[in-house]
Structure formats: C-alpha cells, structure tokens
Amino acid sequence: MIKWGLFGAVKPFRSMVPLSQTRSLIISKSSLVRSKRVSTIRPQLAPVNPYSKIYGRRFFSSSHKLGVNTKEDSSTYLFGRKISTSESKMLKSLLVTIWPKNKPSFKLRVIFALSLLIASKLLNVEVPFFFKKIIDEMNVDWNDQLGTVGTVIGTLIIAYGGARFGAVLFGELRNAVFASVAQTAIKRVAHNTFVHLLNMDLNFHLSRQTGGLTRAIDRGTKGISYVLNAMVFHIIPISFEISMVCGILIYNYGLSFAAVTLATMLSYSVFTIKTTAWRTGFRRQANNADNQAATVALDSLLNYESVKYFNNEGFQASKYNTALTNYQNASVKVATSLAYLNAGQNFIFTSALTAMMYMGCNGVATGSLTVGDLVLINQLVFQLSVPLSFLGSVYRELKQSLLDMENLFQLQNHEIKIKDASNAKPLLLNSTGVPGEIKFENVTFGYHPDRPILQNASFTIPAGEKIAIVGPSGSGKSTILRLIFRFYDVESGKIFIDGQDISKVTVESLRRSIGIVPQDTPLFNDTILENIRYGRLDATDKEIHEMIDKVQLTKLIEDSPNGVNTIVGERGMMISGGEKQRLAIARLLLKRAPITLFDEATSALDTHTEQSLLRTIRKVLTKKANTHIAIAHRLRTIADADKIIVLNKGQVQEEGTHHNLLQNPNSLYSQLWNIQENLDIDEELNEYAKETEEQK
C-alpha cells in the first residue's frame, strides 16, 4: 500500500503499525502561534507625580507628534503648577489633534466654536445687569411715570430674557460645532493606537493582558473627549468669566468686594488642587483593579473549555470576585473622598457668599448701594458658583481623564522593534529562475537571553525544493519559521532570501511573499467564506469555492445550515481542529505565496483525511516550482521531501534525504523514525510500566 507524504508518494520501508498505537510516543513540539497567555506582570508605566497640578502658563509646542517621545524637558503648567512630563506630552499631543496642519477648515471650525463660547460668556455676564436695572426701575412712583416706567421695564425684561436665552443658545451651538472636532480627535488617537498595536512584535502581544489593553483603550478614548472639552471650552472661558466679574466688582464697588472674591477663588483653588492630588492615588488604584478584573473575565471566557474540562468555574469566579473586591474598595475610597471635596468646596463658597451679602446689605442700609446693586452683587457672585464649582470639577475630572489616558498613550510610546530599516527596499524574488532560496548564516536567537534556542545555526534551503525540518521538542523548529516570517529579529547572524538580507527589506514585501499554516490556527469570528478570503482579500467567491473543494471542506459546508456563510465562532471554536486546519490550508493556497511554510499542517486530521489532503497539496505545490518548508512530527508525512534538516539543541545535527538519513542507524533521524515505527515500543512500554509501579 502506498502512503502519501506532504510532498508525494512514500513506499513503506518496513512493517508499519497503526499510528494510533504510536502517536503517544511521537515527540511533541511547541506550536508556531500559541493561544495568548495572560501575563501577570503589569506593563511598566512612566511614573506620574501624584502631586503634579494643572492650570496654565507655558503651553504647547505644535511640533510635537502624536504619541512620540521627545527629549525636551520643557515644563508645562496648568492651574499654576507644573505637571508631569507624561501629562505634558499627552496635552501637547491633543493640541495637535484639534489644531492640525494643512486643515484650514478644521481650524476655522475651532475658531468659530471659540467665538460662540466668548459670546455666550459675555451675554451670561450681562444678565445680572439687566436684573439690577429692572429692580432699580421698579423703585419709582408708578403713578407719575406709568407709561415710561412700563416701557423701560418691559424692554429690560425682554433684554433679560434675550440675554439668558442667547447665552444658552450660543453655548449649545458651540457644543454642536465642536462635536466633530472632538470626535475626529478621538478617532485619530484610537486609530493610531490600533495601528501601533498591529505593528508591535509578537513578543509584545504574547506578554500583554488583552482585557487590560482593551479596557485601557476604551477609558483612554473617553478621557480624550473630556480633556478636549475641558481644556478648550471650560478652563479658558471660566478664567475669562472670573476675570470679568472681578473687574466689574472693582470698577463699580471698590476693592473690598473684589478682595473677598479673589480670596474665595484662591482658597477654593488651593483646596481643590490639594484634595484632588490626594484622591489621585485612589483613582489609580481603581483603574488598576478595573484592568485586572477585565483581564480575568476575558481570559476565563477565552479559555471557556479549559475551565469546563477541569471543573474550575469556582476558581475562576473566585479570581474575578477578588479583582472586583479590589475595585470595589478603591471605588469606595474614590466616592468618600469626593464627598469630602464637595463639602469643602461648598463651605468655602457659602462663606464667601454670606460675607458679600452682609457687605451688600450694609451698603444698602447706609445708602451707598441700591437694592439693585445688592441684587447685582448677589447675582454676579452666585453666577460664579457655576463656573467655580465646574472649575473644581474640571480639575479633578481632568486629572482622572489624564490617568485614564495614561495607559493609552503609554501604548503608543512602546517601541516598534520589527520595522523597516531606513534604507529598506522591497523583496525582489528571482524572476529568471525558481524563486525562494533561503539561507541561514550563523544565526543565534533566543526568546530569553539566558536560554538560546538557535546557536550559530547555518543551512541552506534551495529554491523550489521541498524541505522538512524535524527534531526533538525545543530544538528550534517553529522558531525558524518565526524568524523567516520576521516575527523576531536574530540576535546575531543573517537570514537571506534570494541573496537579500531580510532585515534590510520591507516587512510588508517579505510577508507578502510568504504563506503559512500554523499549528494553532487562529480564525476570526466571521463566516467560513470570509476567513478563507482573508488569505487574499480580492479573491472572488469562485476562487474560494475552488479552494474549499481542494481541501475537502465541502462536507462541512453541506452540513452547515448557512453553508459558506456559517459563523465559525471566536477563534474558530465552533468547528473542529481538523476543519480549522483545512480552512487554514485553503487560505494559504488562495494567497499564492512563492514561499510556503507548514507547521504541523495536518496534525489534527485523521489518517484517511490526512493522506487524501496531502495528495491534493502535493498536486497544487508541484504546479508551482516554489519553496516549501514543512515541520512535522509524523515523519511519514515528510519522508518524500527533497531534503530533511534535523535540528537538535539549536543546531543542525544532520541533513539529507529520508533514505540517506536512515542508512546511518545512529542518526537522530533514525532514532525518531524507529520510535514511530514501533521498533522500540516494547522497551518504552516496559519503562512506562516500571514508572507506574514506582508511583503506586
């Protein structure tokens, strides 16, 4: 009986036993792309001084690029105090988003919104003056001047109502005009962060907490919206309104009223700033606990089957409850400290209002002030309560939003390790002959400095040949595929494709030339059709159906209620492992890449389906004289390869054809083959029996 390998027909060399009897002896290996493991190590963030304050002198440099570290140590001030470097960079970055270069229409919209805001504040300050005049005009003899007084008062009432309505109208128009500005800024930052995350290396994503990342982005974008509105439409306008009120009080009523007002502003601001700085630590604790809770929940749901396999629902619920308890405790501290802040602010303002009312009543009693003046002073000071209370709210919410934005901008500050060199050029494959020669020259690489995976590995994969890479677990097989695909850069040595150093070609052109079937096939929560189309986005439905037939997915399509439009579930959990691998192979064939990599591409298939699919793959690959590399533990599937490279301890121990390697009975390949061919099965079973007996 003829067996089929990945690259062609293979005749049996000796008596073979069913794979089911020897599968337990096949040496296992790590997958090319593992399911993401949640790291318990929180990303190290730049320290934020909890006592840094906000309220403004030196402002922003328009040359600052979004999310880019700068070496300048220029200080930024807000609310009269120096804020931290990280907060300064965030504020500068936000200014760029609302005042972008080469977008005059965008700038005009910002200017128009600011104009509406100023008009709203001017009308708002006029309202108490109309009220004062109405009161004073009422204090006359109506019998002598009924018509005149009625006309004047009627006009003042209309003006009063018009000013109040106009202030509200201009304020709402301002919000409408600025809405697109804020949303555009949010979209830009979120998009840039997402693109930056996609450009990060594989190691970054394998070591990060997915739930924490998504929550940080969500809170960060909301924080951007608040900061933009607070900075542009509240801090400056509130300062403008307070200045106008103080000026009016000094001009009309002397320094005493203005002194009380200024003392109130100062006391209010100092109390708010100090208390908010104290509360910042509680908010940061709440954010960290919130991130941890989101991470635990997401990790538990992504690993739903593992939770069920080991009956650990209670354990996961306990972990989630612990994270929620930490968040609850931190949130209680946030709420109680907020109550203290609000009570203190109200006490300061109420004391000031009481003092000014006493001074005003005393003026009326002595005849130096009219009743209208008393009303005006009361209205002006009381009117300040809204922006003043909002000023405190703005400060504490601004600090909170900056904390929420902190992780978002820290993500953008992570260095992209795998990127194009300054002089990178597109990969040019051999156009005159067969493309895809791959050469490793003294390559050394390890995921950790103290544990190298490859050590001075050198070998050549000829163009157009079918190469298999085998070896014990941890010998570096999957690492080679990752390095070819440039998920990582080598520590030393070089990798060439058609004579070009892959570190000096563009990453996009390199990966466009390579197709891969990973052992763990990640799929999108989309239809079968769209998951296959992901291999080549411009592929037609007809081409996709051809690939479905070639990889024998027709039965799955026929049995599915929605056919090719069946949703495969998150990461493909709603279809079997074998179906996922066939779908991945269909996606690879659709890509038409000149270099193809197979990492245990048929490990989840039964023997019959595997043999049938291998024949199909061989036919497709034979038509294209390209380079094909396969990693396998089932040595029968790669025995027909043009060359087999045997790795051991990070180095090439031997290489050759299947026949040549078997001629040396002491070769590592022969040992692996003999184990799988059951020649040593009795010895293995005896050792297993002894170990079992010892354990008893």
UniProtKB/Swiss-Prot annotation:
ATP binds at residues 447, 471-482. It is a multi-pass membrane protein. Residues 132-154, 252, 359-373 are mitochondrial intermembrane. Residues 68-109, 179-227, 274-339, 396-696 are mitochondrial matrix. Glutathione binds at residues 279-283, 342-345, 392. GO terms for cellular component: mitochondrial inner membrane. Its EC number is 7.-.-.-. Keywords: ATP-binding, Membrane, Mitochondrion, Mitochondrion inner membrane, Nucleotide-binding, Transit peptide, Translocase, Transmembrane, Transmembrane helix, Transport. CDD domains: ABC_6TM_ATM1_ABCB7. It is found in: Mitochondrion inner membrane. Residues 438-674 form the ABC transporter domain. One of its GO terms (biological process) is intracellular iron ion homeostasis. Residues 1-67 form a transit peptide. Residues 110-400 form the ABC transmembrane type-1 domain. The chain crosses the membrane at residues 110-131, 155-178, 228-251, 253-273, 340-358, 374-395. It holds the Pfam family ABC_membrane. InterPro entries: AAA+_ATPase, ABC1_TM_dom, ABC1_TM_sf, ABC_transporter-like_ATP-bd, ABC_transporter-like_CS, P-loop_NTPase, Type_1_exporter. One of its GO terms (molecular function) is ATP binding. PROSITE patterns: ABC_TM1F, ABC_TRANSPORTER_1, ABC_TRANSPORTER_2. PANTHER family: ATP-BINDING CASSETTE SUB-FAMILY B, IRON-SULFUR CLUSTERS TRANSPORTER ABCB7, MITOCHONDRIAL. Performs an essential function in the generation of cytoplasmic iron-sulfur proteins by mediating the ATP-dependent export of Fe/S cluster precursors synthesized by NFS1 and other mitochondrial proteins. Hydrolyzes ATP. Binds glutathione and may function by transporting a glutathione-conjugated iron-sulfur compound. Homodimer. Belongs to the ABC transporter superfamily. ABCB family. Heavy Metal importer (TC 3.A.1.210) subfamily. This is Iron-sulfur clusters transporter ATM1, mitochondrial. It comes from Debaryomyces hansenii (strain ATCC 36239 / CBS 767 / BCRC 21394 / JCM 1990 / NBRC 0083 / IGC 2968) (Yeast).
